[in-house]
Amino acid sequence: MNGYIYIITNKSFPGWVKIGVTEDIKSRLRTYQTSSPLRNYKIEYYIHHPDCYRAEKTIHEKMKPFATEIKNEWFKCDLELVKGRVEESLEPEENVLTFIKRGV
């Protein structure tokens, strides 16, 4: 799928990051937001990728040591570490893409 790999954080859960994929960043963030103060998610980074499911799978493999559950997209680690693992996981020709820092 042509789409985006994104990294989400939440101040209520410091030190945790979520790595996921979507076709539409803003729509995806809206699915997380509710009136609960614990649902204040922020998209920290996203990057467009022509095969985001394949790339996400590779990134999740690299992040396994930081996962608490096998099929979970949440990882206990530093945001900069995750960003580095995403960059490492891209094919060399894909690595020309850059992260876009957004507070969506």
Where are the model-predicted features located?
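Non-catalytic accessory segments flanking enzymatic or RNA/DNA-binding domains
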Residues: M1-V104
